[in-house]
Design a protein with these regions (language model features):
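C-terminal/peripheral segments of proteins
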Residues: 1-328
């Protein structure tokens, strides 16, 4: 009938009001759970006003407080995905596939971080420094997508860790986790939750009052946000010069890989090895999927590598729903 909806399920605890979910809960009884959240109080929606639903491991609703996870923040990919979906008409499976490609190859946090750097450069005399100017030119020309040899993402990833330390180290010192993803701007290996939380706080601290959720605590201790941002960029240039040489064009991103030993690997991006795109059409379902290691993931299988090259190019194979289609 064309209806869409979702219901968030599971047994979610009603916690004691005394519990601070950021800290371990004492096991002395008075902090025990008070039952489960009723189903009608869980996030759910049917036929939302925007006409679509999207998800990328994000919170099920802004108001829902699931205290067991913190991998959210102003940079989570769901915002870019929603903005892209709303501008697609008509919405087809092939166009949805491109949304996945864009989400998987776009730098995960650049859309939140890049405006901080470029804004600080506009407000300061950073461009008077030849090295800063050259780095800023790479960042200004960047389309936020990652590719082998991409200099801008290498600069941003290095800046990210240094900016986090400069912004938060006064409070966290040796407890400060590395503010990074997994070295290439994707989540291929999965960052620690502490890294994500630190990055979220760093972004909000550097955004200041303009943050969607401004911080109440002054982690910067009155220091200039622009000074921290440009200072971290200077440091990043120094680190990259020391590790990759003076020639900035050689600071490009090196890809990581999804291995298919003994076959050659494919480039690793923010994706699963199994992806399906299904349209609930009438009279038949319409869909495509990709599963590069095969269902068995057995290197001895004759079909182990059938989909490897397709996956490397973000391509899909048709999903067959009828037995007669199998013999065509």
């Amino acid at each position: 009938d064309g209806d869409i909806g979702f219901w968030f399920t599971g047994k979610m605890p009603v916690r004691s009001a005394k519990v601070d979910r950021r800290l371990p809960t004492p096991g002395t009884g008075e902090y025990d759970w008070k039952g489960d959240i009723p189903f009608d109080q869980m996030p759910q929606v049917v036929n939302p006003k925007q006409g679509f639903l999207v998800n990328w491991n994000n919170k099920p609703a802004p108001w829902f407080d699931n205290g067991d996870d913190s991998e959210w923040g102003p940079f989570w990919p769901i915002t870019d995905i929603a903005n892209e979906i709303k501008d697609i008409a008509p919405l087809t499976t092939s166009k949805v596939a491109h949304v996945g490609l864009h989400a998987g190859t776009r730098h995960m946090v650049a859309s939140a971080l890049l405006p901080l750097i470029l804004g600080a450069a506009e407000r300061t005399d950073a461009d008077n420094d030849p090295k800063l100017h050259a780095a800023l030119q790479y960042l200004r020309a960047w389309n936020l997508y990652q590719w082998q040899g991409d200099v801008a993402s290498g600069i941003l990833d290095t800046w990210m860790g240094l900016a986090g330390v400069n912004a938060l180290a006064d409070d966290f010192g040796p407890m400060m986790p590395a503010v990074s993803l997994d070295g290439d701007g994707t989540r291929g290996g999965g960052p620690k939750i502490g890294m994500i939380a630190a990055l979220s706080v760093t972004v909000r601290a550097l955004q200041g009052p303009q943050a969607s959720l401004p911080l109440k605590y002054d982690y910067l201790k009155g220091k200039s946000r622009d000074e921290i941002i440009i200072g971290a960029l200077k440091q990043a240039i120094g680190v990259l010069e020391a590790t990759k040489g003076k020639e900035m064009s050689k600071w490009g991103r090196q890809p990581s890989w999804i291995k298919f030993d003994p076959l050659p690997p494919i480039p690793a991006t923010a994706r699963g090895t199994y992806i399906q795109i299904v349209e609930a059409a009438k009279p038949d379902l319409n869909g495509m999927d990709i599963l590069p290691p095969g269902q068995s993931e057995d290197p001895q299988s004759p079909h182990y590598g059938d989909q490897r090259e397709l996956a490397g190019y973000w391509l899909f194979k048709p999903m067959l729903y009828k037995r007669e289609d199998l013999v065509k």
